Design a protein with these regions (language model features):
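Hot-dog-fold acyl-thioester-processing enzymes
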Residues: 2-81, 143-156
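HotDog/MaoC-like acyl-thioester-processing domains
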Residues: 1-14, 94-156
Length: 156
């Protein structure tokens, strides 16, 4: 377990940002398909994917969206944040083996603890794969919480 301290609304500043990295693995794609029910063969079947414009299997777009959600919930503003909305543009496919940098930046502080965030994702080549914006309700007070350790989950 690890301790994480959120950043409450009053401490957020325009321009403040965080970058979280994650390598996309085979198991991520399989688990996301199993949990979401999105069994599109472009994600799961190499032979099928070879006949698409991508020429190979790709990760689910919303898997990348989930990484954005995790960065907001766990890093900026962090625990206690409530999602109000999200817009995503998928610029390029995410491939298995890609290392993604999820960048969350404070764009604007709005009334009633609402915050507008830039949500961008880049691959290991510096190519932007996702561009978006989120609106969240930031926590009112600073809290340090213990983040639970997650069990190892497998797909059989």
């Amino acid at each position: 377990m690890s301790l994480v301290t959120n950043i409450p609304y009053e401490q957020l500043t325009v321009g403040q940002f965080v970058v979280v990295e994650r390598r996309v693995e085979e198991r991520d794609v399989l688990l996301f398909a199993a949990v979401s029910g999105d069994n599109n063969p472009v994600h799961l079947d190499a032979e099928f994917a070879a006949g698409t414009l991508f020429k190979e299997r790709i990760a689910h777009g919303m898997f990348t969206g989930a990484l954005i959600s995790a960065a907001i919930a766990c890093n900026l503003p962090g625990p206690g944040t409530i999602y109000l909305g999200q817009h995503l543009d998928f610029a390029k496919p995410v491939k298995l083996g890609d290392t993604l940098s999820v960048r969350i930046q404070v764009l604007e502080k709005l009334p009633k603890n609402r915050v507008r965030l830039a949500t961008e994702v880049f691959n290991q080549h510096g190519d932007q794969v996702v561009d978006g914006e989120a609106e969240v309700l930031a926590p009112r007070k600073e809290q340090t919480v213990e983040m639970p350790s997650m069990p190892t989950v497998t797909v059989s």
